[in-house]
Amino acid sequence: STKDEVIVGGSPTFALWAELSEWNLSPGTVTLWDQGYSNLFPDLNFEIAAHLLTRVISKPNKNLLCLDLGHKSVAAENPLEKRVYFPEIETYKIISQSEEHLVIECPESDKFEIGQHLIGYPQHICPTVALHSKANLIINNNITSKSWEVTSRNRV
């Protein structure tokens, strides 16, 4: 006789279903935990595992930084203030985003140089990861030459 396979659980219910070893889990976000679930489920105690590397490409005005993090790089389905979080910037407001650029208002903009790299945590990793063909791996806080192919990018 064939035993039926039960596939359960998304990321929010991962902790509940993880204890039921006879069932297969199907969470996606636990692999690349994002800012959104970090805010919604702090009790799950996962670290944010999806980081976006961006850089300051210009300073178009006083207190403004223009980053190369447009909606070709980070999912744009959320309101501006809920698309990406910058842990290295104490106070900022996202004021616009286009295909290629994201502009933030930042009172501490003098601290940042053109060309400087910044890390952004995506609010929602699922549509963000599909924008990229691979994910580079950071292991023990070191950037490596290893990467994962993002198969959702080119599926038929």
Protein language model features and the residues they cover:
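Active-site anion/phosphate-binding pocket segments in diverse small-molecule metabolic enzymes
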Residues: S1-V156
